[in-house]
Amino acid sequence: MSEIEKKLATLSNGPGVYLMKDESGEIIYVGKARSLKKRVSSYFLEKPNRDLKTGILVKKIASFDAILVTTEKEALILEANLIRKHKPRYNILLKDGKRFPSLRIDVRTSYPRLEVVRKVKKDGAIYFGPFSSAGKLRSTLKIINKTFQLRKCKQKEPPKRNRPCLNYQMGQCLGPCCLPVDRDEYLDMVNEVILFLKGRTNDLLQKIKEQMAAASERQEYELAARLRDRMFAIQATVEKQAAVTTDFVDRDVIGIDREPEGSAISVLYIRGGFLLGSRNYNFDEVLGTDSESIQAFLRQYYDKDRFIPDEVFVPCQLENMELMEQWLTETAEKRVVLHWPQRGEKTRLIEMANENAHEALKDRISSENVFKSLLERLQKRLRMDRPPRRIECFDISHTGGNQTVASMIVFEDGKEAKSEYRTFNIDSLDHPDDYAAMHEVMARRFSPDKDWPTPDVLLIDGGKGQLSITASVLDGLGVMGAFEVISIAKKDEAKKETMDKIYRPGQANPVVFGRDGDVLLFLQRVRDEAHRFAITTHRKKRAKTIRKSALDSVPGIGEKRKKALLRHFGSIKRLKEASPEDIAQVPGISVKRAQEILEALDA
């Protein structure tokens, strides 16, 4: 009897969690079961209709562990915690990507305002969203700003001002910061905004009509005209929208599609009967049925800081439907309905979500095939043993040699891997020296104490000189030859060159790409991304320096002049070395003020 058979014989029939391991002892799958014995044993029984990926997984299982718990709810929670901890290859794993924005309004403040947030908190405020694109969010805010006159200032309560801001002059704010604005009237307008964002436009239009009629009876014709304009603006907006349901319920609709190459899950955001947007999630190798995949997805997707609507539609019957509904209700701290529609108009929503997932998966597979071909041709041009999976690119950015920052960006399988991006602050230089900066960066990147993945290709932004210094440093570190090192130099238009050039160490002539021009374009894209990231990081560092500099102690120098001085001289050190006449060249600075600046800096 094998070790697995011995373990199967001792398994309990109670609920629990099981961890499948490969020959190296790595956990490759975590699952939960109502009956551990039945579920785990099913993996090792021959089944003619077995899922393809299940068959692949079973061949890789060398051992397993099982954890017995008291209830199915405990198993559900433990499974999610173990998946989060071990990140098994064959489980659904949601990456911590940037969340879609939502709108937040806190009606407990004196004069509530709308703000854009990416985290939904249980703080008593009202949230609307998520908005699947910044464009849709901006369009919604534009309509609200034109139609309603909510304040825009960022403080929790309106700041005290002597005169109203530009928004008041444009008719887009009532000016509660300095004008006597009736709070009850303002809150009426806030409630109208809430009705608008909930999609209850019929109720809103009826309310505005009643207010308009009442204002006319009181002979408040200016107010009646404003209400009329607001009503027309809302009607024009509603005409452009198409409702997907006849009720006003907020719901998320989940769809799924699976192929041998991977799977995709799509979420449709329906708010107040209108489709607000959608988001697709792609996964590589995933084990289990649609039910298991959807259940694992829900546990991670709604785990924290996420708006949970009143209803969640799923495309199939889940094994633990009641348990999942209970968990959603407890997490949301309100009643949440988990439903599998099987008839009527609601099944059309599931079809839409499934089709969305299908298109997302099809696009992803097509994209992967394109990148696979591209990387295979790059392998051929660089004469490598295998296609490069991980490409790292470095770039240097500075202001006259000061505040030098080096960026490292990573592409994996042809796509940006932003979680792998790194920055290096080069504080040892106070003058322009890209070679010295690159020397320090390479020494730090490939230092023995850095337990980072080894790249297949290291791409340097620069010509033969940059490549030579990089190769020299790598050779000194003992890593030269462990991966391919190349540099990308811009075309020399004076020599009538038509494309950028790729150089390899020890070769005078650039690599010839011939018909593989798209491979060169890909490397240019990698270089441009490194350049973008370096500049963005450098700007942040420079802004931080501007905020906290020796100039803060100089009387009469505000933020605007401080920026102008640092932009002109590049650093405090160079400013100190300048003459009063040189400093007076900066707009807004007189010779007398320049002398005061130098005296303050020397103090």
Swiss-Prot record:
**One Gene Ontology molecular-function label:** excinuclease ABC activity
Q: What does this protein do?
A: The UvrABC repair system catalyzes the recognition and processing of DNA lesions. UvrC both incises the 5' and 3' sides of the lesion. The N-terminal half is responsible for the 3' incision and the C-terminal half is responsible for the 5' incision.
Per the UniProt record, the source organism is Desulfatibacillum aliphaticivorans
Q: Is Metal-binding given among the entry's keywords?
A: no
Q: What is its main location?
A: cytoplasm
GO biological process: any one?
Answer: nucleotide-excision repair
This protein is called: UvrABC system protein C
What's one GO-annotated cellular component?
Answer: excinuclease repair complex
- Where does it reside? Cytoplasm
UniProt xrefs under PROSITE patterns: GIY_YIG (PS50164), UVR (PS50151), UVRC (PS50165)
Cross-referenced InterPro entries, in alphabetical order? GIY-YIG_endonuc (IPR000305), GIY-YIG_endonuc_sf (IPR035901), GIY-YIG_UvrC_Cho (IPR047296), Hlx-hairpin-Hlx_DNA-bd_motif (IPR003583), RuvA_2-like (IPR010994), UVR_dom (IPR001943), UVR_dom_sf (IPR036876), UvrABC_protein_C (IPR050066)
